[in-house]
Amino acid sequence: MFGWTFQDSKGPRGQDYAVARSGNVYVAGLVEIPAAADGAKLSRWLPYVSVANVDEAVSRGVDAGASVAVSARDVNLGRVAALVDPEGAVIGLARSAFGDPDETTTAPAAGRPVWTELLTDDTAAAATFYAELGGYDVNTIDRRGGQYTLLASDGKNRAGILKKPSDKIMPVWLTYFGVDDPAAAAVLAESLGGKIILPASQELRDGTMAIVTDPSGAVLVLQDWTELRGVR
C-alpha cells in the first residue's frame, strides 16, 4: 500500500510488534491486540502526543476529565501511556528515549503519516483539554467555508480538531497518510482487502482525500500530501 518495510519485535507484554519504515524513516508501529469477546472490530490507528514526562501528563489528563486506557509503562523506545479523553477519543502519550524526530523527517510526503485530526462533539472543550495535556497553542482558521481548530507548538501546526459530521460517529482521532492520488490509493486499498468508506470526490475536500478501512477494520485517511503545505 505505502511501500513500507517492517522490522519484527515484541510489545511490552510479549505480543507481536512490528516497526514500519518508509525509506529510512520510522513511521509507525503495529501491535497485536486480543480479539473482542463480542467480535467487535478493535483495530485502530493511535496517534501519540510527545510529552516531557508521561506520568505527569497522565495526571494532568485525569485531572482534566480523562480516564486511563493504558497505564504508564516503559517500552523499548521509551515510556508510553494512553488516555480516553473527556469526549471518549483515545490518545497515546509518549516520551522517546531517543528524543523527538528531526522536523525534516516528519514533513508531509507520500507513504508517511502526514496529519492527525480529532472528530469530536465539542471542539472548544477538546482544544482546551489538549492545550493543557500537551502544552499546545490553539488557533482557529477559516477552511472551505467553516472554522477549523489547530493545535500548534514551536510555530508548527501539529493536529486539527473538527466537529463530528454525524452523531453515529464516536469521537475519534483519524490518521492521514500521504498519497499521490487519493482515488487510486483507495482502489488499491480495496484490492488489498480493505473497504472504501468515502471515495475521493469533489464534494469531499475537492477530491484531495478518501477514507478507507484496512483488512483489520482500522480507519485511515488517504490524503494528497501536497495539499497540506498550507496547513503544516
Where do the model's predicted regions map?
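Core segments of cupin and vicinal oxygen chelate
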Residues: 1-25, 63, 71-78, 118-157, ...
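Conserved donor-binding loop and adjoining core beta-sheet/short helix segment
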Residues: 10, 22-25, 29-39
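Vicinal oxygen chelate
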Residues: 21-26, 47-87, 123, 176-219
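Conserved beta-strand in the GNAT
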Residues: 28-31, 82, 91-92, 159-162, ...
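A generic structural motif
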Residues: 33-34, 75, 97, 164, ...
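N-terminal beta-strand motif that seeds the catalytic metal site of vicinal oxygen chelate
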Residues: 44-49, 94-127, 133-139, 172-175, ...
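Short glycine/proline-centered loop/turn elements that form peptide/ligand docking sites
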Residues: 142-147, 202, 228-229
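Acidic/His-leaning functional-site neighborhoods
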Residues: 149-178, 183-188
